[in-house]
Each structure stands twice: as C-alpha cells, then as structure tokens.
A protein has these predicted regions:
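N-terminal cap/lid segment of alpha/beta-hydrolase-fold proteins
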Residues: 1-24
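The serine-hydrolase catalytic nucleophile loop
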Residues: 37-49, 228-229
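Conserved alpha/beta-hydrolase
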Residues: 49-75
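Alpha/beta-hydrolase active-site loop
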Residues: 80-102
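Active-site nucleophile loop of the alpha/beta-hydrolase fold
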Residues: 134-144
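Conserved loop-alpha-helix segment in the C-terminal half of the alpha/beta-hydrolase fold
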Residues: 221-242
C-alpha cells in the first residue's frame, strides 16, 4: 500500500487529504467523507482505507473545509467546522470527485460517516453513475436537524430559539463569522453557520429515492434510530439497501472498528465482485 498527502484547491482554502493506492493496478476507487468536527486521520477515515486497499481500491480520505471544530494553517485566520456551510461541503465533495476523475477514477464508491454520510446521499443523488454507497451512521439531516440534536443535549441544547435569534441579529449586523458558544457539542459555531445548519442541511430521507445504486447503511445499537434512520432510508431508497445494526456499538465505532471493516469490505466485495488480497 502506498499513501500520499495531497492538497485539492478550492476557491478559498485547499482540502488536505491522504490518497491510498494498492500495489499494482487498482480495480476501482473510493471517496471517504468525514463527520462533523472530524477529519481524515480519525475514525472510519483512518481505519477503513487499509482494508479497502486490500480490495484493490484506490482511496481518498480528505478534509472538507469544515473539518475539526476550529483550526488554522499558515496564518492566524481561523477555519474549520465552526464555519462550515452546506453548500461548501457539497462543493468540496464534488472537488474531491473531480480530483479522483483526473486520476482515472470517474465513478468512485462513496463512503460517508455521520454528517459525511448525509452529504454522501446528496452527492450520490447528484451522481447517479456511482457504483455503490456505504453510509456509516448517516444522520437524517433536514430542517429540524438542530432541534433534533438539541433533544440529545447537542449544540444549542434547550437554547435553540435564543441562539437562533442571536445568530440572526449578528448576521444582520454583518457579524456572520463571529462565534457563538453553545452548551453542547460542537461548542462553538459562527452565526451564519448556525443559521445555515437550520435551513440548508440536505434531507437524507427526501433524497433516498434518488439513490439508485446498491447501498449499505450501518448503525450502532447505541445510536437512536430517529437520528440515524437506516431502516427508513432502506424503505425509501431507489435501489437495494442492506441495513446492518452493529451490537455493542456507539456512533464512533470505538472498539468495533474490525467489525465495521469486515461488514464494509465483505459487502463491497459482493457488490463489486472484488477479492480481498491475502496478507
């Protein structure tokens, strides 16, 4: 396996990532989309590529502009998930897909975790030639995403209306990139990002009928079905959908990484007629 740090340009900041290649000719490719406040070197984007490469797939795990919570690079200008916008996340995934196409892989498998899974559904709906989609605890998205998360103590908690009103006032005053502290994960968000999340987040279930390729949807048994609607997506999907509920498993697959590897790799090997290379 070979791995190369890469940088994909956008109209603002570049997308950093790690590109993996199998030894010899690749049988196909996969794009991996991370979840909220995460990045390409943690979670599923860290532990899946080695197994995907054994299937003969070239893989790109990359940061969207909305990675981590807050970060800087070669300046003191902040960036990261606190500033993310849905339209930028959608375009970042398209930029990564174009980057893969330039390397000879115009139709990669799409794999997304959590928020990356929701964005993966939007991407595949827009790219019907996608051969397969793997959703790892993809959330439901939609216009009630902030309220739904607040019921679990995330983000604004019981202060949704208060913080939304504050965010609207800040945007009107030209302070859209100023940060608001929240009582729950992810703890800090810009005013414009907060409002964008409330109104512009794609709806996973509304988009499901447009997904016609084979889909794998994984959810841990410790995750609420209402937030990660695997069965409902499967009922609405435009193509076949395999639902896997993993026992003793949280949202980040802690301690269950090998199980997730096995489920994803065996499903892809069946769907794409691939064989796992022996060590």
């Amino acid at each position: 396996m070979r791995a190369e740090l890469v940088s994909i340009p956008t109209e603002t900041i570049p997308l950093d990532g790690l590109y993996y290649e199998p030894e010899g000719r690749a049988a196909g490719a996969a794009l991996l989309f991370h979840g909220n406040t995460m990045n390409f070197y943690v979670g599923a984007l860290r532990f899946l590529p080695p197994m995907l490469v054994k299937l003969g797939l070239a893989c790109l795990a990359f940061n969207r502009r909305g990675h981590d919570i807050l970060s800087t690079r070669n300046s003191r200008v902040p960036e990261g998930g606190a500033f993310q916008l849905a339209r930028e996340g959608i375009e970042d995934n398209r930029s990564a897909a174009r980057w893969m196409a330039e390397r000879g892989f115009p139709h990669p498998v799409i794999i997304g975790h959590s928020n990356g899974g929701m964005l993966a559904v939007r991407h595949v709906a827009d790219h019907p030639e996608t051969p397969a989609l793997a959703l790892l605890s993809a959330h439901g998205g939609g216009r009630n995403i902030v309220q739904r998360g607040a019921q679990s103590g995330l983000m604004a908690g019981d202060r949704v209306e208060e913080l939304a009103a504050r965010a609207r006032d800040m945007v009107k005053a030209g302070l859209g990139r100023e940060l608001i502290l929240m009582p729950g994960w992810w703890y800090a968000i810009s005013a414009e990002s907060f409002l964008d999340r409330m109104t512009e987040t794609p709806d996973t279930l509304e988009l499901a009928p447009k997904v016609r390729c084979p889909t794998l949807y994984i959810r841990g048994d410790r995750e609420p079905r209402a937030s990660y609607p695997a069965e409902d997506f499967g009922a609405r999907a435009g193509g076949t959908c395999t639902v896997e509920i993993v026992a003793d498993c949280d949202h980040f697959y802690n301690g269950r990484e090998v199980v997730i590897q096995e489920i994803v790799s065996s499903w892809l090997s069946r769907m794409l007629h691939l064989q796992i290379a022996k060590s």
